[in-house]
Amino acid sequence: MWWLAGLAALLLFAFPYAERTRNASERPRLLQGMALVDTGSLAIDGPGARGLATGPDVARDPLRGRLYPNKPPGAGLVAAAAYAGARGLAAATGEPLTLRRYTWWARLLAGVLPTLLLCGWLARRFAPELGARRMWLALGLYALATPAFAYAHLLYGHQLTACLLTLGAALVVDGCRADRPLRAALGGGLAGAAVGVEYSAAFAGPALAVFVLSWARRGRWRAAVGALVGAAGPLTLLGLYHASVYGGPLRTGYHHVIDPTFAAKHGEGFLGLVAPSWAAFHTHLLASEGGLLWWAPLAPLALAGLWDMSRGTGDSALRSHARVQLAMFLALVLACASLNFEGGWRVGPRYLVAVLPALALGWGRALAWVSEHPLRVGLFVALMTWSLVINGLAGDLWPHLDLTNIHQPVSEVLLPLWRAGRTPYTPAGVGITGALIAGLLGLLILLRPGPRAAAIAAGLGVAAGLGLVAATALFAPHPRGAANLAYIERVWEPPPDGAAVSAILEPLSR
């Protein structure tokens, strides 16, 4: 559990927050949480909103004209729990509740805690088969050196979705294999709930359904029924929400977005899902601004590990898990390659974040190949260092990059902020460099390069990884890059003289 405590410390160390940015993905969920607690309504344009701007990511109820988040309500429900807790704590201490403090609690419940729960559960489940040290290194890579680190700092719902979907799929696999209906039902319920947080989780459904049906044919029909019944529960509730707000169980907020640009995009194909295209594939996997291979270049190694496990001899549980996780990952890749929009403010490919935990399982196998071979160790450590540094800078400093006016976010945003000594809200205002070093040292300790040659290769790998980060300066900056950075610096919190003023969320008079 010491490694989990270390992850918790690094995830909680920094609170990157700038109230004036009005984060379009977070603000509607925050307003929905407030409205639900204060007024009992999920609409965000009533008195519970307290006059705060909703941003563009909203939809209009065609029946009554009310405004709602254009996303499913799952993250808003978690935000409501955070708001109720923060409101109760404020009442107990006599301090006013601010939007900043409420946001911290919401991000804790919807970002940090799901990430820690996911890592702890995966370690307990797979460490006996893959080795504790190797599994914790894989989980460290996932939590610190992929975009999961940035989204753990936000109320986007991506980490909550990843936790629900991954745990749900794993419980379904184990439940079906052992013919345990209750476990399968719990797994189905968690996987179904993931769709209630993020619609894109539904694209993982066919892979899981194929597995369930294949085991039903082997006689595990009780578990198969359990999984289907479990999934039906949250999906039915989501359909009832859609019917109540938008007039039909299959009518979503995306059908009724109020922003004209969003409406045009979602009006193409099936809510913006069109035929696969090279442009979309490049955007989500290859582009230096937000592609997977830039923000998690060790992903191919993990996919190779999943492929190797999925082809294993015998009928092991690991093989089943690897097949399901690999299939879900590839299904989301195909969905991303078919989107006609890029994802707004983001770090890396945000629509793949729900299935990034699959990489942890793949690394759990593939790390055995790194072994003590100096060349492999050096290359691995170089890419690990690069990944940890850029994801750490993004997650701790500015986890919602608007790539409209950016060619290379590392050189145009993250490194300039770090060089200028910009520090988010941290304990005693301590800078983030120490946290980055601590994370890198932790991963190196878990890697434990053995012979002298491998240790030297690891040291050279660290230097090479840092060199890669510095080399991003070779990218030609966007013509509007300087203006974009100036805006970030203008709204930066905390200012030099302490905490910025935050909106006070006064209790509503009954």
Ranges and model annotations:
Residues 174-177, 203-235, 239-240, 303-317, ...:
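Perimembrane helix-loop-helix junctions
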Residues 223-305, 322-336, 386-405:
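Membrane-lumen/periplasm interface segments of specific transmembrane helices
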Residues 119-122, 210-213, 293-319, 323, ...:
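Hydrophobic, aromatic-rich transmembrane alpha-helices
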Residues 2-5, 91-98, 119-144, 162-163, ...:
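Transmembrane-helix signature of polytopic, membrane-embedded enzymes
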Residues 158, 168-184, 310:
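Membrane-interface transmembrane helices that cradle and orient dolichyl/undecaprenyl
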Residues 33, 138-139, 143, 183-198, ...:
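Membrane-interface alpha helices of multi-pass inner-membrane proteins
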Residues 105-130, 167, 171:
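Transmembrane-helix motifs of polytopic, lipid-linked glycan transferases
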Residues 9-10, 135-146, 166, 170, ...:
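Short helix- or helix-capping micro-motifs
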